[in-house]
């Protein structure tokens, strides 16, 4: 799973996921399913935000990479991916500026068009079950919830899906591709099932030589589809800006 994650996701996303796990004392090399889940969630948050801007009239517009008007204000502020101290600093700044109600839990995004915080969910289960879990945890009507699944389903607060259909389809397609690639490498079942995940973890530990004396065959084949999985959705200029913004505060 770790090899898959490093080949499948943008290096910046992998780096942010590693830092997030280490912040909580977790090891990406051991808890590989969580590593994959965090990378997937980060990517969906970035895709949710990318190419969405607010023009001088306060209207939401979609501008593709390379457009000369790309200096317009981004519609979404990305909170997910920052260390907790910086994330809360951003949230407090937004609340002071917009007078939005401060959330009890760190949200993933802030939508400047709708003036609300957004919680993004990516689930391997039924969307309505995960939605209810999120809503029960947050307990706030002020935070908008949007759930995506690997099967193409989605659910959002008051059926308000925020983004246009094409932008949401892009996210759903990416999630479906990740699922298909995991399945082709025999990783999907362990990603979905906790019991299967434990079995896969034991297998991974053996392959790393931590269970010496137990024979195991490890496949090093790389799926051809992985060669075209490098995400092309992210504005290269914004990628650099996001990297600098997210990582500079973590340097010691």
Curated annotation (Swiss-Prot):
Segment forming the signal sequence: none
Which keywords describe this protein according to UniProt? Decay of host mRNAs by virus, Eukaryotic host gene expression shutoff by virus, Host cytoplasm, Host gene expression shutoff by virus, Host mRNA suppression by virus, Host nucleus, Host-virus interaction
Establish whether keyword RNA-binding is in the entry.
no
A GO MF annotation of the entry reads: RNA binding
- Site (Important for efficient shutoff activity and nuclear localization) found at 195, 198-199
- Do you know which InterPro entries this protein is assigned to? PA/PA-X, PA/PA-X_sf
Locations listed in the record = Host cytoplasm; Host nucleus
GO terms, biological process: viral RNA genome replication; viral translational frameshifting
The keyword Secreted belongs to this UniProt entry's keyword annotation: no
Q: Name one Pfam family in it.
A: Flu_PA
Where are the residues marked Important for efficient shutoff activity as a site?
202-203, 206
Q: Which residues form the active site?
A: 80, 108
Gene3D superfamilies associated with the record: Influenza RNA-dependent RNA polymerase subunit PA, endonuclease domain
Q: Which residues form a coiled coil?
A: none
The family annotation for this protein states: Belongs to the influenza viruses PA-X family.
Domain description from the entry?
The probable endonuclease active site in the N-terminus and the basic amino acid cluster in the C-terminus are important for the shutoff activity. The C-terminus acts as a nuclear localization signal. The C-terminus is recruited to host protein complexes involved in nuclear Pol II RNA processing.
What is the recorded function of this protein according to its Swiss-Prot or TrEMBL entry?
Answer: Plays a major role in the shutoff of the host protein expression by cleaving mRNAs probably via an endonuclease activity. This host shutoff allows the virus to escape from the host antiviral response. Hijacks host RNA splicing machinery to selectively target host RNAs containing introns for destruction. This may explain the preferential degradation of RNAs that have undergone co- or post-transcriptional processing.
Its recorded name reads Protein PA-X
């Amino acid at each position: 799973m770790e090899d898959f994650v490093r080949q499948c996701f943008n290096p910046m996303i992998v780096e942010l996921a590693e830092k997030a796990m280490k912040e909580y004392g977790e090891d990406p090399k051991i808890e590989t399913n969580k590593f994959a889940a965090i990378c997937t969630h980060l990517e969906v948050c970035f895709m949710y935000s990318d190419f969405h801007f607010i023009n001088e009239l306060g209207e939401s517009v979609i501008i593709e990479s390379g457009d000369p008007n790309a200096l317009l204000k981004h519609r979404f502020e990305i909170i997910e991916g920052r260390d907790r101290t910086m994330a809360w600093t951003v949230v407090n700044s937004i609340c002071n500026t917009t007078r939005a109600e401060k959330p009890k839990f760190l949200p993933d995004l802030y939508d400047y068009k709708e003036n609300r915080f957004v919680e993004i969910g990516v689930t391997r289960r039924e969307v309505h079950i995960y939605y209810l879990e999120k809503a029960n945890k947050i307990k706030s009507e002020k935070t908008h919830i949007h759930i995506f699944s690997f099967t193409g389903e989605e659910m959002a607060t008051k059926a308000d899906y925020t983004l246009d259909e094409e932008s949401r389809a892009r996210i759903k397609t990416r999630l479906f591709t990740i699922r298909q690639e995991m399945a082709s490498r025999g990783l999907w079942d362990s990603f979905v099932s906790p019991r299967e995940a434990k079995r896969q973890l034991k297998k991974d530990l053996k392959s790393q030589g931590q269970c010496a004396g137990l024979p195991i065959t490890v496949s090093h084949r790389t799926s051809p589809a992985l060669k075209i999985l490098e995400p092309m959705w992210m504005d290269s200029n914004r990628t650099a800006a996001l990297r600098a913004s997210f990582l500079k505060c973590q340097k010691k």
